[in-house]
Design a protein with these regions (language model features):
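Extracytoplasmic
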Residues: 1, 23-26, 34-43, 47, ...
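An acidic, Gly/Ser/Thr/Pro-rich helix-cap/linker signature
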Residues: 1-23, 29-32
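Short, functionally critical alpha-helical segments immediately adjacent to catalytic or ligand/cofactor-binding
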Residues: 38-53, 98-101, 156-157
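Secretory-pathway/luminal and periplasmic proteins that interact with or process carbohydrate-rich
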Residues: 50-60, 71-76, 104-110, 124, ...
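Substrate-binding/active-site groove segments that recognize
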Residues: 62-74, 120-135, 156
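Phosphate/pyrophosphate-binding betaalpha-module
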Residues: 71-118, 123-124
Length: 249
């Protein structure tokens, strides 16, 4: 984490985020009030995914999805065969979703560009996510995630609110993370998932308490990071989980 942070959270990226927020403050405020997702979170996603729209991908989405759907690279490793098969099936479904999306949104899918995996727009939505979570933010009857900022902001916020399965998505006003204070005799453990499955009492029993006030009924997971000055321990709450559901990386 210490190495990744230095290379990724540069001053230029931070300054770019501030400028982007200032430029789109009114629309971001409206979306934040409607969905309960902070403007800073929405803009951070755009900054991470596409450098605030500076690079949305140069691959033709149709070609990328077709290649991964029918020519997914095989390693020849039997232990990876099942995983590679699932990935191929995933991209076949996304290819079908792309054709449906083109019909619904009147898009020329042959001209769309995006990532090598078929993600599109400033928020890098896959076709299935585009169809399920994109919203018309300005009332013009279309959902444009490439150039219409009201649609882009509202769609990212809507994704946060609705994506999450049985656990649900973003909780307005809820905590994201809190630095953990280690108690004497704390027990080392590393949860296998990002799911916030532990009560504060359970975490306290293991020797981890939040350094800042949080709702007593909140649940969390433990996140361990290799910081510049040694290992860091954080508690990740429901809204942290919602962020990981957008993109684990």
């Amino acid at each position: 984490w210490s190495e990744y942070r230095v290379g990724f959270l540069t001053q230029a990226r931070i300054d770019g985020g501030r400028r982007f927020i200032a430029e789109h403050r009114d629309e971001l405020t409206r979306v934040e009030q409607q969905y309960g997702v902070p403007a800073e979170v929405i803009v951070s996603i755009i900054g991470v995914e596409t450098n605030y729209g500076g690079f949305t991908g140069r691959h033709k989405v149709l070609d990328a999805l077709y290649t991964l759907a029918f020519r997914y690279p095989r390693s020849g490793n039997p232990e990876r065969a099942a995983y590679e098969y699932r990935r191929e099936q995933f991209f076949r479904d996304e290819l079908a979703q792309l054709f449906a999306l083109g019909r619904e949104e009147r898009l020329d899918i042959a001209t769309l560009t995006g990532s090598y995996a078929g993600a599109m727009g400033l928020g890098q939505f896959m076709p299935s996510s585009y169809r399920e979570f994109a919203v018309d933010g300005n009332g013009d009857g279309r959902r444009d995630l490439f150039a219409t900022y009201p649609d882009i902001f509202a769609s990212i916020a809507n994704y946060f609110r609705k994506k999450g399965g049985e656990r649900g998505g973003w909780v307005p006003g809820g905590a994201v993370v809190a630095r953990a204070q280690l108690q004497d005799g704390f027990a080392e453990f590393n949860p296998e998932t990002w799911t916030p499955d532990y009560t504060l009492a359970q975490l306290a029993e293991k020797g981890y308490r939040p350094l800042e006030p949080v709702a007593p009924d909140a649940t969390a997971t433990l996140v361990q990071l290799d910081g510049a000055d040694g290992k860091q321990y954080w508690l990740g709450f429901q809204n942290y989980y919602a962020i990981t559901r957008y993109n684990n990386s």
